[in-house]
Amino acid sequence: MEINAKPIDSVNVEVSAKVKSDEIKASVEKLAKKAAKTMKVDGFRQGHVPVAIVLKRYEKELTSDAEQDILRDVLNEAIKKSGKKSDELIGEPLISKFDRKDDGIDVELTASFKPSVSVEGYEALIPEFSTPRVLKKDIDEKKNELLKMFAPLEKVEGKRALKAGDFAKFDFEGFVDGEAFEGGKAENYLLEIGSGQFIPGFEDGMIGLKTGDSKDIEVTFPAEYGAAHLAGKPAVFKVKINEIQERKIPETLDENTLKAIMPNEEKPSEELLEERIKDQIRQDKIFKLISDELKPKFAEAVVEKFKFDTPKNIVEQEIDMQFRNAWNGFSEDERKKFRDDKDAVAKKRDEYRDDAEKSVRLTFIIDELARVRGVKVSDQEVVQAVYFEAYRSGRDPKAHLEMYRNQGMLPAIKMSMIEEKLFNEMFSKEDKKSSKKEKAE
């Protein structure tokens, strides 16, 4: 076996190899002998199957396995020749050539290794920021929203028009092509106007009606509607308003309401409620500040400052992902062109290369920052996060976890959690230049 290993840069090695046919044959026979010891074949005792029989029946599979073994041998030998360490190898090698010939196989591949990353001086790149202020009006608005959720419904007397936020108790029946359809009728149905529970246009069509009013509301079922026989079809709903209700927010908070809003507090009070609301608003504002401003600004700065060679295979994977994500945005003509023209695909992929390089570099920088700052996420935390996601979407947690595991997504989820934890810690609640106590205004 002839192997050459030529460094492209500090993390990528170009490998070329010539594997002779007798080496391939020897590898196939070795695998056949091993298989013969355990294989069951009718007419032969287990462990006494002739190698020739194994070769005859499973030559294709054995050859494929032998080629995989040879590829591993080529890679291992190339690692030694390049002076790299096997535990520094990252991802699968990019195989650019694997030509089978009468006298053997010609192999060309690129092996990539984890880069050495230094983030010395990163602290100077953390953007200056001030902790977002929580205003008194923010607290009052959120408090009213909470109180509205727990406020009892009261009947609206008289002939007041129905408006968004009201609850309508009404009868309705739906018709498509002049015919009533199953599930399209109800009496004294209670609906919050503006909640979006009904198909688009239905609730808007009810606004302005008064108790006792009737109306035909014309709507169109969404194209993606769950019932295929109704999807995309126009419909008419005959509605009659029986009663209008509204939530009455109490002027003062009684003990029962406070306990309902804060069930885990031993001594709930209006002051404690406002403090909890203030904390939540502050956390929401900090999260938005990090997500919208601080993180992008910091990411751009560190990618620009910390330069290093990136693993070619990881960059290519990132390009593939960006290309796939963009696919739905392409016109049908563009898709057809990409299906038929490999050169067009290659040219389009190159448009994502710079962004892919930056994305990969940022991933390694974040990994090093997490190491330096001691930020870790355990496998158990990942499982809990996946389970929580499953519970929220009404899915089976174990099946949801297994789906991510089978897709190889758990490492990416873990990295995302490490990143979130890192930035939340880095951009703490205190001002970078000051630690002035925040006050509600």
Swiss-Prot record:
PPIase FKBP-type domain sequence ranges: 165-250
Reaction equation(s) it catalyzes: [protein]-peptidylproline (omega=180) = [protein]-peptidylproline (omega=0)
Top EC category: isomerase
A GO biological-process term: protein unfolding
Any one of the GO CC terms: cytoplasm
HAMAP family: Trigger_factor_Tig
Database matches in PANTHER family: TRIGGER FACTOR CHAPERONE AND PEPTIDYL-PROLYL CIS/TRANS ISOMERASE, TRIGGER FACTOR-LIKE PROTEIN TIG, CHLOROPLASTIC
Similarity field: Belongs to the FKBP-type PPIase family. Tig subfamily.
Role: Involved in protein export. Acts as a chaperone by maintaining the newly synthesized protein in an open conformation. Functions as a peptidyl-prolyl cis-trans isomerase.
Protein name per the record: Trigger factor
Organism name: Campylobacter curvus (strain 525.92)
Gene field: tig
